[in-house]
Amino acid sequence: MSGGEVVCSGWLRKSPPEKKLKRYAWKRRWFVLRSGRLTGDPDVLEYYKNDHAKKPIRIIDLNLCQQVDAGLTFNKKEFENSYIFDINTIDRIFYLVADSEEEMNKWVRCICDICGFNPTEEDPVKAPGSSLQAPADIPLAISTAPPSSQVGASAAAAPPPYQLISLPPHLETLGIQEDPQDYLLLINCQSKKPEPTRTHADSAKSTSSETDCNDNVPSHKNPASSQSKHGVNGFFQQHMMYDSPPSRAASLSVDSSLYNLPRSYSHDVLPKVSPSSTEADGELYVFNTPSGTSSVEPQMRHVSISYDIPPTPGNTYQIPRTFPEGTLGQTSKLDTIPDIPPPRPPKPHPAHDRSPVDTCSITRTASDTDSSYCIPTAGLPPSRSNTISTVDLNKLRKDASSQDCYDTPRTFPSDRSSSLEGFHNHFKIKNILTAGSVSSEELDENYVPMNPNSPPRQHSSSFTEPIQEANYVPMTPGTFDFSSFGMQVPPPAHMGFRSSPKTPPRRPVPVADCEPPPVDRNLKPDRKVKPAPLEIKPLPEWEELQAPVRSPITRSFARDSSRFPLSPRPDSVHSTTSSSDSHDSEENYVPMNPNLSSEDSNLFGSNSLDGGNSPMIKPKGDKQVEYLDLDLDSGKSTPPRKQKSSGSGSSVADERVDYVVVDQQKTLALKSTREAWTDGRQSTESETPAKNVK
């Protein structure tokens, strides 16, 4: 053991070097603090493998100690509630973990007493109450500073070894400034008026009804509230009210919930109308009817199930719009209309006075489709009428008093007139109605299904008019197969036939594409699965845990440079160290002396493992390969060239290049001689180990 008086000894956990704080364990070692004031020996801190070991693992010279910090925190699970202090030397920082706070304070007090350290005034992260100014018998007054209660208790428990200097009084504010801001200050917030979110709710409502093939759903609300909306779907963004012919706007009664539609336009007739004042305002026609929004929709949900869903993708079937006389005069197809427009139908009477042929009245809810209506026509037997009977209508109207609006479709370009005209003529000849939606009770009698490839239902003759609204997307025309009309059943409502107008009809999906997904047996309940092996990857140095950091209760002690000048580092700092612990072998090293002469370095590296000279010590420049050129022309003197040896063995000549004449015969002879010598040498070397084997 080293000489000196033993001041303090005990068990401490020592940290590995700074670069190995996480990968290496913190070993428990027996530390001995020795003071050499009486004996003249240096002040050292030794640590041993155990308390009865003879040789220390390492000796820390306290003359090289610069600072001592107590009360550190380390972001590691096993050191959450530990008492850590460090000894900062020139060579390395030693982090030591004590078993209790009293033991940590004892070690710090003894080390600071030997080194002559005082608490540092320029510590920016010092906590309130960590000053250690009060003696042990005088407790700190920590009631005035609530954040410093924990610190004051720990500071009062440790008696100071010497008279400490005063600390700055405003430490509480410094500690608070260092803490990160976990809360958001209201000063940094900026109040802003939220934008109306009603349009988002409407757009969400429209997407929820996409599977109902519903492009235009009547709004069962008051007209004043529905005017503030933008639209239910993506096709008609500008209008929320659904259009109706202006000729009927004046004739309908205000308090009636049943509307009369004009007779069928499939007889090449267009009613004579006059433009109203509301047509210039976006063609919004408001019908003030009793609205029962909250009670109607839940009661009428079952009614929408009995109606047909039009199978044509991306289209809605609406009642054609009437036009002013000036607009109708510009069309070319109207010349072929032979009939005279019928008179305007009378005002609606009580439901029992009307027949199903005279009127078409269907209550519709928000989940209903726009194809749920029928156009009455003259001369059609009541038994084949595609309308719901008057008795059923009365029952429906008694259950729900909702307003009903009808949207008249926009006109089509002239290139679609041929298909629409043929479709109109077919209805005229066959004298059948458009396939409307009926209830489930009359499904066997009045149901006329649509062909999936059928065009949109238009009951007016083909007339051309430029599209007036920019947001209107025309329906996709299709070739109508009259032979199969009414022979196929439309797809169910859950198929969701709604797409863009450019989307082609859906093709039948092959069976191979409908295979179920593979079964994941790991999802089986109570299945015992072998867990995957834990993949442990070594962390790079920059991802490893950092060293223990300073906390609000950290106290730092350093030497006063004016009173205690730092002694120069001795040459043989580690000369007294001996290693008896293989775990700390990385700590034992021989420092390099920068004043070592070249002769000493050669002597130091003369002995190697194989007994020869070390190739690392001997310079490579001693052995050089020189190249000679054959001067075959004896009469011509070639000046010598300087050769430069590169790493690959090739010579790099100077800027001046000399050319010589080579005798081909002599060169070939030299080449053959060299090859023969090389072959003979290789054969000799290959025969030698063969003889040894025998």
UniProtKB/Swiss-Prot annotation:
Sorted alphabetically, which SMART domains does this protein's record hold? PH (SM00233)
Q: Which GO terms describe its molecular function?
A: signaling adaptor activity
Name listed for the protein in its UniProt record = GRB2-associated-binding protein 1
Gene3D superfamilies according to UniProt: Pleckstrin-homology domain (PH domain)/Phosphotyrosine-binding domain (PTB)
> Can you quote a single GO CC term?
cytoplasm
Q: How does it assemble?
A: Identified in a complex containing FRS2, GRB2, GAB1, PIK3R1 and SOS1. Forms a tripartite complex containing GAB1, METTL13 and SPRY2. Within the complex interacts with METTL13. Interacts with GRB2 and with other SH2-containing proteins. Interacts with phosphorylated LAT2. Interacts with PTPRJ. Interacts (phosphorylated) with PTPN11. Interacts with HCK.
- Positions of the PH domain: 5-116
Query: PROSITE patterns annotated for this entry?
Result: PH_DOMAIN
Q: Where is the composition biased (Polar residues)?
A: 204-230, 358-374, 594-611, 685-694
Pfam families tied to this protein? PH (PF00169)
Q: Which residues carry this modification: Phosphotyrosine?
A: 627, 659
Q: Which residues carry this modification: Phosphothreonine?
A: 387, 638
- State whether keyword Phosphoprotein applies: yes
The question of whether Acetylation is a record keyword is answered with yes
Going by the UniProt record, its keywords in alphabetical order are:
Acetylation, Phosphoprotein
Region annotation (Disordered) maps to 194-231, 309-378, 492-532, 560-656, 668-694
Fetch the InterPro entries from UniProt.
Gab1-4-like, PH-like_dom_sf, PH_domain
Q: Where is the composition biased (Basic and acidic residues)?
A: 194-203, 672-684
Q: Which organism was this protein described from?
A: Bos taurus (Bovine)
Modification Phosphoserine occurs at = 251, 253, 266, 304, 402, 454, 651, 683
User: Which PANTHER family does this one have?
Assistant: GRB2-ASSOCIATED-BINDING PROTEIN, GRB2-ASSOCIATED-BINDING PROTEIN 1
Q: What family does this chain come from, according to its entry?
A: Belongs to the GAB family.
